[in-house]
Amino acid sequence: MPTRTSLSTLAGTYPILGRPLPAVLSTVLPDGRLQSTIVWFACDRQHLLVSTMREFAKARNLRLCPAATLLVVNPDDTTDWVELRANVSLEEEGAQDLLDDIGHRYTGLRPYFGQVVPADLAATEHPVTCRLTPVAITTPPPVPPLDRPAVLSTSHTQPPPPRLPTPVGCGQDADLPADHLDLLDAPLAGALATRLPGGFPQTQPVWYAREGSDILVNTTLQRRKGRNLLADPRATLLIVDPVDSSRWIEIRADVDLSTIDAEQQLNALTRAYTRHTHYYGEIYPLDQRNLETRIIARLHPRAVHCDAIHR
């Protein structure tokens, strides 16, 4: 399981938060789906600060459901990441100054209106600060050594795996834009957002593969995202161009879960993303396959959004 750390160590424990890296902010839409977008952020003692505009969807989402998840991934090592689930307050006082500070942090330019984006946008866009107060911090779990003593399966003492949901069937798929298929066909780290039982988004890096108009992600029934999808088979996948963070594709999807050929698909992802050919035995200990049930999460796109408003 991912590890959770005391909030008192937030500033000093996570050097990644001190870097001007694009982050993924996931918020809850009125229909219960999740919106994931790229944001710039800053740290303020025990808070994270994100600047957006009063008119933007994420601000509207947060007015209705003031909970969000921020994911920051090290672009040099995608196994190094921090996920922060937070309660959010929206503040307009001082929002313009913070917007200028964050814009300068990421671009070296100020003011935001006039240097980062055209000055005339100030007439129609009104800054608001999203103050995130973390309630949970998650980091990657340590990978067990390949030569660890064999762990015996305890499946005989556990209830059988839950029955997988009935496939969602043939809904109205959203088209995947041809000019963004390069992001879907490259071995990049995607950010998969699912709903936790309490309503918070869970957003963590995943491997993925495109199969026609569907996107395939591999997980297990025992992991949190697998349990989330059993309870609510909807997810949002965000993939960002590593060269230009204003270019991205966000896919809101219905999800089918299947155990059929799940380990074979996992090995295909392993070959695409690493120098290895098999996940179990080369990345994770071989006996781990006896401790978990692999599933393919097939994402059927229902809505697709691309690119930042200002590029």
Sequence positions of predicted segments:
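Short beta-strand segments
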Residues: 20-54, 60-62, 68-72, 81-84, ...
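Short secondary-structure boundary/capping segments
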Residues: 14-15, 60, 120-122, 181, ...
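Amphipathic alpha-helical interface surfaces
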Residues: 13, 58, 95-98, 180, ...
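Charged, gly/pro-rich active-site loop segments
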Residues: 1-7, 75, 80-175, 242, ...
